[in-house]
């Protein structure tokens, strides 16, 4: 795509964003429900486009796990529409006053929620990101420019087309939801430098994509990190509970960022627990990559490498390490994790509190699966991503995280002395 064409997308989105700022909550919710209905009504078009993407994925030898991230079904399309409807039911943050006070000069000062403006989103395989991002940006008063990966090109394109058609039918600018129809690296890099039109850029995808955006972009970036998530089984853990949590965190959907990638286990329960968890994971054909002590206990495992401790597998692979203490577990996590989601399984209150306080991550759990780090599960509705940085937003990013604030000041003739 030519730079001039990309700038035109940006200009159109910027101008359209001002019209969105004039809509009240009722109008936005009505339009969101229209979009949801359009997605459901056009399921055959979506499935047809998705079939093209799946065919190309198979031709290029993409793994079945990654194809699952790409695949759409009637049920998943319905879930996408329901996600849009849920966003319509959420409280609108725009116009909310976070705080208000009167200063010594008699000025009434309020801090009010406002849209960020135009949001650019660069993302990979999962087509549901398209509808999640579009609906969240729309409800929070932002225009959006979407640039998906080549794997889901046809799916993303038809989804945006359907959303734009729904807006056009209601005499609303389709430029509120823009689509970059060029998946080349050069166009992506141009988008990352579109400072005149983009207010923020949000990458969603693997480590390489996020690293590229962070090192290339001149537009401000909100980092949605990869998920090298850990579960630590303490010496005071309920082992039956631990088994259920680990199987859920690893096997329910291994291709997502909140799936567990490494299991740490206290040495005092390793011999009792590792055979049990090996048997449970074997039903899902999970490959175990273990340290020396775990290898001595497992029946079938391969030696873990240094790279395994820092890898987000997104597959039926689990790295396993036996640790001497809670302190060693925390040190390992803080060294190798991606600041996403970490969990301890323990009935020891003091061990649990130490873990929750000392582990550096967007979400830390006690006796629960890391799979709950999700906008829906947190009650935010659809999410734009899981932020693993500490500035602006951290954790699942819902509507409030897609806003900024401005100060609104009421006076009565005051002049500063």
Swiss-Prot record:
Pfam families in alphabetical order: Aldedh
Catalysis: reaction(s): L-glutamate 5-semialdehyde + phosphate + NADP(+) = L-glutamyl 5-phosphate + NADPH + H(+)
Claim: NADP is one of the keywords in the record: yes
Keywords: Amino-acid biosynthesis, Cytoplasm, NADP, Oxidoreductase, Proline biosynthesis
Domain of life: Bacteria
UniProt-listed GO biological process terms: L-proline biosynthetic process
Pathway(s) per entry: Amino-acid biosynthesis; L-proline biosynthesis; L-glutamate 5-semialdehyde from L-glutamate: step 2/2
GO molecular function: glutamate-5-semialdehyde dehydrogenase activity; NADP binding
CDD domains reported in the protein's UniProt record: ALDH_F18-19_ProA-GPR
Subcellular location, record wording: Cytoplasm
EC number: 1.2.1.41
GO annotations of cellular component type: cytoplasm
Function: Catalyzes the NADPH-dependent reduction of L-glutamate 5-phosphate into L-glutamate 5-semialdehyde and phosphate. The product spontaneously undergoes cyclization to form 1-pyrroline-5-carboxylate.
Family: Belongs to the gamma-glutamyl phosphate reductase family.
Protein name: Gamma-glutamyl phosphate reductase
Gene giving rise to this polypeptide: proA
């Amino acid at each position: 795509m030519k730079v001039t064409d990309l700038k035109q997308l940006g200009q159109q989105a910027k101008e359209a964003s001002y019209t969105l700022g004039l809509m009240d909550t009722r109008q936005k919710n009505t339009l969101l429900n229209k979009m949801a209905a359009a997605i459901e009504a056009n399921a055959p078009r979506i499935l047809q486009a998705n079939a093209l993407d799946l065919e190309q994925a198979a031709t290029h030898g993409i793994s079945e796990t990654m194809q699952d991230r790409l695949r759409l079904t009637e049920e998943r399309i319905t879930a996408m529409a329901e996600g849009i409807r849920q966003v319509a039911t959420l409280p609108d943050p725009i116009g909310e006053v976070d705080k208000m006070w009167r200063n010594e000069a008699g000025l009434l000062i309020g801090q009010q929620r406002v849209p960020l403006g135009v949001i650019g989103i660069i993302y990979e395989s999962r087509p549901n990101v398209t509808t999640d991002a579009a609906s969240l940006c729309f409800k929070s008063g932002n225009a959006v420019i979407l640039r998906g990966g080549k794997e889901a090109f046809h799916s993303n394109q038809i989804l945006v087309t359907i959303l734009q058609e729904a807006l056009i039918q209601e005499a609303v600018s389709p430029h509120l939801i823009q689509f970059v129809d060029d998946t080349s690296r050069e166009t992506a890099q141009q988008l990352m430098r579109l400072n005149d039109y983009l207010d923020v850029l949000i990458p969603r995808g693997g480590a390489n994509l996020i690293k590229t955006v962070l090192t290339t972009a001149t537009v401000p970036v909100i980092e949605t990190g990869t998920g090298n998530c850990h579960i630590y089984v303490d010496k005071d853990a309920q082992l039956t509970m631990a088994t259920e949590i680990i199987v859920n965190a690893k096997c329910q959907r291994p291709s997502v960022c909140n799936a567990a990638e490494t299991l740490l286990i206290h040495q005092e329960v390793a011999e009792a627990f590792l055979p049990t968890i090996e048997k449970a994971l074997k039903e899902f054909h999970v490959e175990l990559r273990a340290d020396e002590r775990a290898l001595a206990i497992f029946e079938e495992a391969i030696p873990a490498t240094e790279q395994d401790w820092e890898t987000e597998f997104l597959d039926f692979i689990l790295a396993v390490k036996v640790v001497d203490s809670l302190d060693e577990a925390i040190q390992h996590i803080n060294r190798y994790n991606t600041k996403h989601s970490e969990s301890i399984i323990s009935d020891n209150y003091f061990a649990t509190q130490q873990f929750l306080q000392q582990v550096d991550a967007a979400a830390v759990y006690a006796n629960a699966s890391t799979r709950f780090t999700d906008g829906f599960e947190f009650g935010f509705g659809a999410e734009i991503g899981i932020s693993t940085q500490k500035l602006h937003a951290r954790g699942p990013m819902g509507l409030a995280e897609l806003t900024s604030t401005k100060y609104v000041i009421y006076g009565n003739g005051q002049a500063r002395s």
